[in-house]
Amino acid sequence: MKQKNTKNFGTRWGFILASVGSAVGMANVWGFPNKLGSNGGGAFLLIYLLFVFIFSYVGLPAEFAMGRRAGTGTLGAYENAWATRSKGMGKAGGLLGWLPLAGSLCIALGYAVIVTYILKALVDSVAGTLMTADTAAWFGEFSSTPFSVVPYHIIVVVGTLLTLYLGARSIEKTNKIMMPVFFIIFLVLAVRVALLPGSSAGYRFMFTPNWAALKDPMIWIWAMGQAFFSLSVTGSGMIVYGAYLSKEEDVVHMAQRTALFDTIAAVVAALVIIPACFSYNLD
């Protein structure tokens, strides 16, 4: 069995914000608005909320509990869980734990590139060069130039490794800053989009269910998959965070709060993107 963790997050809200920070990502900002727009609008939203509610009582608490009971990472948690069936099953569980771990590593590699591009865009926005540039030409120029974003990539990788090296308290402090900033930025954008002409059609699309769409099994499948991915269920992140959750905390309560703020992030992102698409007549 792997060495157990003996340090926890400093506060309840620190754990929740860190968990939300782990869950919120492309699945919320890009995936949810995209699937909402292409799968029936309000009908997809209702089904998605149903699955989020279910997973906040079943899947997410189970992963927090697995991590907390084992007090270690994904491999140790899977080994511990399978060993409860029989001693010989522990090794098999540890091997199975490599699947979500490998998946998380692949996602991290992709995110490192995406965050590098975002950092590049931030720097160019602050410098003013992006404000007047043709965005397609701007992206094409630096993405086709060898090593043009290497300095930004180094900053992203070093910053990530430093945060991880400093432990759970460092992740907690980072998310206490970054997650409120994330919500503030998207709320400001949502207000700005609400003032655009024609944006009201986007709100009607989002919140008026097409009841006939509920009969389409593919919409149910897409909504369930989106809820899985958005909450990071069946990954390794929530199991690892569970290892740093205090024994006094209620895992179901923590999972519900995590799911709530994760869903708010997804809906706010959709409130920015979908009405803007209707306003600018984008497909």
Which stretches of residues belong to each language-model region?
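Hydrophobic alpha-helical membrane-insertion segments
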Residues: 51-60, 99-120, 181-190, 261-273
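Central hydrophobic cores of alpha-helical transmembrane segments in multi-pass inner-membrane proteins
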Residues: 27, 47, 52-64, 68, ...
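Membrane-interface "cap" regions at the ends of multi-pass membrane proteins
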Residues: 1-31, 59-64, 68-95, 246-250
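Membrane-embedded translocation segments of transport machinery
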Residues: 2-9, 172-283
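Alpha-helical transmembrane segments and their helix-start/interface "positive-inside/aromatic belt" motifs
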Residues: 14, 41-49, 91-108, 172-182, ...
